[in-house]
């Protein structure tokens, strides 16, 4: 029988040299490309979102009644100006969720520079991808769909909570009066479900200030 601690120790010894080699290559890269090092530090700065507190433009809104999903879309684009590593998308509902980052292009295998992800109609996979992006680090991802479809996200959203992964969920159309789509699109019990989930922080803003 081999103990887990022994296996762990052996792995540390085995992998020490490759790690040191990688660190040396990274240090050389940073020295050669200081502007990329600055960008790297910015992308891994966990205090970056706090800079929004002192951003007057971020807090200014037109004082008139507006749909909260429109305000949410405006908010995402304001955040994008200050937080360059904001990255995400919707489950084939971006025009309705208002989650498109304007002027940022679409992320695809043909173009890695885009910041808008098109997940398709697959809420569960989208949530898993979002968790993976957070765990990898370097980006602040968000995922979006209609609130009622959080049912399809639930098993993986629960894993977000268990891992304490700060994935951002943008869940719009939180109303029993969503119009022509009828009762299949009217969220009733979903709010209670998410609020009952440990480590899942639910914010339900009613206007621009909130």
Where are these regions (language model features)?
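Thiamine diphosphate
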Residues: 19-210
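Single conserved hydrophobic/aromatic residue that forms the stacking wall/gate
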Residues: 1-12
């Amino acid at each position: 029988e081999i103990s887990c601690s022994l296996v762990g120790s052996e792995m540390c010894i085995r992998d020490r040299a490759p790690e040191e080699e990688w660190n040396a290559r990274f240090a050389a890269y940073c020295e050669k490309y200081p502007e990329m090092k600055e960008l790297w530090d910015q992308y891994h700065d966990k205090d970056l979102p706090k800079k929004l507190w002192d951003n007057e433009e971020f807090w200014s809104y037109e004082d008139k009644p507006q749909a909260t999903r429109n305000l949410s879309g405006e908010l995402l684009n304001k955040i994008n100006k200050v937080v360059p590593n904001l990255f995400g998308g919707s489950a084939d509902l971006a025009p309705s969720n208002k989650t498109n980052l304007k002027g940022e292009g679409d992320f695809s295998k043909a173009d890695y520079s885009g910041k808008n992800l098109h997940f398709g109609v697959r809420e569960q996979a989208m949530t898993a991808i979002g968790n993976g992006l957070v765990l990898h680090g370097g980006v602040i991802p968000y995922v979006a769909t209609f609130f009622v479809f959080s049912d399809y996200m639930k098993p993986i959203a629960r894993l977000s909570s268990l891992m304490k992964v700060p994935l951002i969920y943008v869940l719009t159309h939180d109303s029993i009066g969503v119009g022509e789509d009828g009762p299949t699109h009217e969220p009733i019990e979903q709010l209670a479900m998410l609020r009952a989930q440990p480590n899942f922080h639910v914010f339900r803003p009613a206007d621009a200030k909130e």
